């Protein structure tokens, strides 16, 4: 089987193909020219005729035909080059005849080659037909496969040859495109040159017009000068005529006078000679004046010509400069366009990068939000686990105390209790009544929020950190002192109805209540530590949610929380004492609820607290009073309770240390103040009449509270036992609040006073926002607005410059309290757990 390309095998078709294709040939030289040159020539229809066959001679014949066409084109070029380079007419004719003979010989040889090729192709066809017949007769399947492979190889060879031809054509087309591009550039350059020449022609035409105008002006000047010369000549002639007339008149008179004389001729001769002398002199003078005037006019004309020539040269120079500047302007415009394109590209890239960065920022914010929610969830789970742990610890401690109470009851006589005064406290009936009240009333949440807005305006940042530390410490101490005084007043009012409602019980009931009070003390201690942990965990969550840069502080706070949780499990005795404290707080909550139930009709509209000095005296005096009260309470607790855990001592030390540190910081960082303006606005809204009464009354010392408690419970020992224990609980609660505030203040000082802080606090696993808390019906709002302005003027001695620093610190405190009550059944007694959380939000705004 044979696969022939009939379309390419036809010589006429191939001629048509070769006519449309131009071949590029490089000629080394010619007989008449000794240089290398390139030429573009098109092959004639009779130059190349080849066929694409399966025979082996086809590529060789095609190559020979291409060589012949290149030789013919080289001969054509040599002919043209000899014509261009020149020579004698005989040489040109001789070379032309030689070239014709060579072309005829080559054409004859090429025709012979073509005939031979046709003959060989015919023979190849016959031989291939015979071979194919033999193959069809004798070939097996394997032989057919070999034949097919051979055919495929041959077809691939032909395909490669066709691809080679195609590549050659593509190369030629590329060369043609390059030539076209080069010709286009040349055409553009020629057009540019034409424009330049046309511009030069227009400039020359303008010069010609200007020169013609100058010529006309000069002609006018020449005409005017000629008119002036004619006028002068006429004047001169008139003067000469006048002189001649005068001479003739004088001659006539002389003739009349000398009429009688005989010697007239001599006199006339003399007169004529004199007249001629005068006329000659006048003529010479007139000619000299004319020549002088003409010379002056010619000099003026030459000067004008020089000025015109210099002006023309300047004009030409200016035109050349204008052309150069126009060229520079075009180049600058090109650079401007390129720079604008680059700028647009850069802006597009910048916008793209900005959009991508915004997408990444949005993604990171979403991830951060997710991590915050995850963190809050983990914190809620942690709080739930802590609550479960605390409940289990309370149960364990209750069972332990029940067992210990049974042992002590069997060991000692029920009526004779001769221990220390404050080791075993007398029971009180108020527990049962309180529990009944908590059954009826709905649980109340009390959350305290503080909004601190600091607006700082200063022209120069100087000693900013120390000043802000002082102001923040003073504000925190004032708020702590005010909250402390309010709680003391509330506790004093609560102690009175508790003492009134305490009847006498049987010895067995007293023993049971002693055990319950011990459990309450243990629960109070545990609740205090849990509140400290909640404050620290809230602060850690606030720092992590608002500022990513404070991750190290969060880790430190988490380590503190872990340390506190480990410390909680150190000893069972400490847990028992904490349970007792929690039960004591349960009693306080129940007393408050009883008072609210008994006196609902006394609720009045909220009244503002009039005395400003009670809320904000000097910070140092407040701090000193708070420390003295804390020390007195600590001493009384040591007298009352013999078995005190080391944890409580550590808590008290922690409470005292931050205030001492704040006082030291105040002493170390003094600030020179020129003018200090303090504006304090306090507005408080209270819904219960009991709280209004506590606000109207001034804070009483702690000793009076103790005396009242002792007088009310004078006949019974439980009253005297109860008042110091309640004061102890109050002290712990207040100290816990102060400690949380001081720790928060230290964190804000470490983060820097100039930065904006907005902290959201998660309390007991609930993310409570201020907007949601304001919607609560039973929530009481306390607002303390403190505005402090500090103006500072410092002068530098060297430069004589004066710095004016103005600071305005506005602190807004909003206190909202919510109470959570939980009920548990334990051996026919009910325990109520009170969790008071303080959520503190600070908004700090600094303006320079």
From Swiss-Prot:
Cellular localization per UniProt: Cytoplasm, Cytoskeleton; Cell projection, Axon
Keyword tags: Acetylation, Cell projection, Coiled coil, Cytoplasm, Cytoskeleton, Glycoprotein, Intermediate filament, Methylation, Phosphoprotein
Region (Linker 1): 135-147
Sequence segments annotated as region (Coil 2B): 290-410
Molecular function via GO: structural molecule activity
InterPro entries for this protein: IF_conserved (IPR018039), IF_rod_dom (IPR039008), Intermed_filament_DNA-bd (IPR006821), Intermediate_filament (IPR050405), Keratin_I (IPR002957)
Major place of residence: cytoplasm
Protein name in the entry: Neurofilament medium polypeptide
Organism field: Mus musculus
Region span, Coil 2A: 264-285
Keyword Phosphoprotein found: yes
Low complexity composition bias: residue spans: 21-44
Basic and acidic residues bias locations: 499-509, 534-553, 577-604, 611-677, 689-711, 720-732, 748-760, 771-785
UniProt region (Tail), positions on chain: 411-848
Gene that this polypeptide is encoded by: Nefm
Domain of life: Eukaryota
Region (Linker 2): 286-289
Chain positions found as Phosphothreonine: 565, 642
């Amino acid at each position: 089987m044979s696969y022939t390309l009939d379309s390419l095998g036809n010589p006429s078709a191939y001629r048509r193909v070769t006519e449309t294709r131009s071949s590029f040939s490089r000629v080394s030289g010619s007989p008449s020219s000794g240089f290398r040159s390139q030429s573009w020539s098109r092959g004639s229809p009779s130059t190349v005729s080849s066929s694409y066959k399966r025979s082996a001679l086809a590529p060789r014949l095609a190559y020979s035909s291409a060589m012949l066409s290149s030789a013919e084109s080289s001969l054509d070029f040599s002919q043209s080059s000899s014509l261009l380079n020149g020579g004698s007419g005989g040489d040109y004719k001789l070379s032309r005849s030689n070239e014709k003979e060579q072309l005829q010989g080559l054409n004859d040889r090429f025709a012979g080659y073509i005939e031979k090729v046709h003959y060989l192709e015919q023979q190849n066809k016959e031989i291939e037909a015979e071979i194919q017949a033999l193959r069809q007769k004798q070939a097996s399947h394997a032989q057919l496969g070999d034949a097919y492979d051979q055919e495929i190889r041959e077809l691939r060879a032909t395909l490669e040859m066709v691809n080679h031809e195609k590549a050659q054509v593509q190369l030629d087309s590329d060369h043609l495109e390059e030539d076209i591009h080069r010709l286009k550039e040349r055409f553009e350059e020629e057009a540019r040159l034409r424009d330049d020449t046309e511009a030069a022609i227009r400039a020359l035409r303008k010069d010609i017009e200007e020169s013609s105008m100058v010529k006309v002006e000069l002609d006018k000047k020449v005409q005017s000068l000629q008119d002036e010369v004619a006028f002068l000549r006429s004047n001169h002639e008139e003067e000469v005529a006048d002189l001649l007339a005068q001479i003739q008149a004088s001659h006539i008179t002389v003739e009349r006078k000398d009429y009688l004389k005989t010697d007239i001729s001599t006199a006339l001769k003399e007169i004529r000679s004199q007249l001629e002398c005068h006329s000659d002199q006048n003529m010479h003078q007139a000619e000299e004046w004319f020549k002088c005037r003409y010379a002056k006019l010619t000099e003026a004309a030459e000067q004008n010509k020089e000025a015109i020539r210099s002006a023309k040269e300047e004009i030409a120079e200016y035109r050349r400069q204008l052309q150069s500047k126009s060229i520079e302007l075009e180049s600058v415009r090109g650079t401007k366009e390129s720079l604008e394109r680059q700028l647009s590209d850069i802006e597009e890239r910048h916008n793209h990068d900005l959009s991508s960065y915004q997408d990444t920022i949005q993604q990171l914010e979403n991830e951060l939000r997710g991590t915050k929610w995850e963190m809050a969830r983990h914190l809620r789970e942690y709080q739930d686990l802590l609550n479960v742990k605390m409940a289990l610890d309370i149960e364990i401690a209750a069972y332990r105390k029940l067992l210990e109470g049974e042992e002590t009851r069997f060991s000692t006589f029920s009526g004779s209790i001769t221990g220390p005064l404050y080791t075993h406290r007398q029971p009180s009936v108020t527990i049962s009544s309180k529990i009944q009240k908590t059954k009826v009333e709905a649980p109340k949440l009390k959350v305290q929020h503080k909004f601190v807005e600091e607006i700082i305006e200063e022209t120069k940042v100087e000693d900013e950190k120390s000043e802000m530390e002082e102001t923040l410490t003073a504000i925190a101490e004032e708020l702590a002192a005010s909250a402390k005084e309010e709680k003391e007043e509330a506790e004093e009012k609560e102690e009175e109805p508790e003492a009134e409602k305490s009847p006498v019980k049987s010895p067995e009931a007293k023993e049971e209540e002693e055990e319950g009070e011990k459990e309450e003390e243990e629960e109070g201690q545990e609740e205090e530590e849990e509140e400290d942990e909640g404050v620290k965990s809230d602060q850690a969550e606030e720092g992590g949610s608002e500022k990513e840069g404070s991750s190290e502080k969060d880790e430190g706070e988490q380590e503190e929380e872990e340390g506190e949780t480990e410390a909680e499990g150190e000893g069972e005795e400490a847990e028992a004492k904490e349970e007792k404290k929690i039960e004591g707080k349960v009693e306080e909550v129940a007393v408050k609820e009883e008072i609210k139930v008994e006196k609902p009709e006394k609720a009045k509209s909220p009244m503002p607290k009039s005395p400003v000095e009670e809320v904000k005296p000097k910070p140092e005096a407040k701090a000193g009073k708070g420390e003295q009260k804390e020390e007195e309470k600590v001493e009384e607790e040591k007298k009352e309770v013999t078995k005190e855990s080391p944890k409580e001592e550590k808590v008290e030390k922690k409470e005292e240390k931050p205030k001492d540190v704040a006082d030291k910081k105040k002493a170390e960082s003094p600030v020179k103040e020129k003018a200090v303006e303090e504006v304090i606005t306090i507005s408080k809204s209270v819904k219960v009449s009991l709280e209004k009464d506590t606000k109207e009354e001034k804070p009483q010392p702690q000793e009076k509270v103790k005396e009242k408690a002792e007088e009310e419970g004078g006949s019974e020992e439980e009253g005297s036992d109860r008042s110091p224990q309640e004061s102890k609980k109050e002290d712990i609660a207040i100290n816990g609040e102060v400690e949380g505030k001081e720790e928060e203040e230290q964190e804000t000082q470490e983060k820097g006073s100039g930065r904006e802080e907005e902290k959201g606090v998660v309390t007991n696993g609930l993310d409570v926002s201020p907007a949601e808390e304001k919607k609560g019906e039973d929530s009481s709002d306390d607002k303390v607005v403190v505005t402090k302005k500090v103006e500072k003027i410092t002068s530098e001695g060297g430069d004589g410059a004066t710095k004016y620093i103005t600071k305005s610190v506005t602190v807004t405190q909003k206190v909202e309290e919510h109470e959570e009550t939980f009920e548990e059944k334990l051996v026919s007694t009910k325990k109520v757990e009170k969790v008071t959380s303080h959520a503190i939000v600070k908004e700090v705004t600094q303006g320079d």
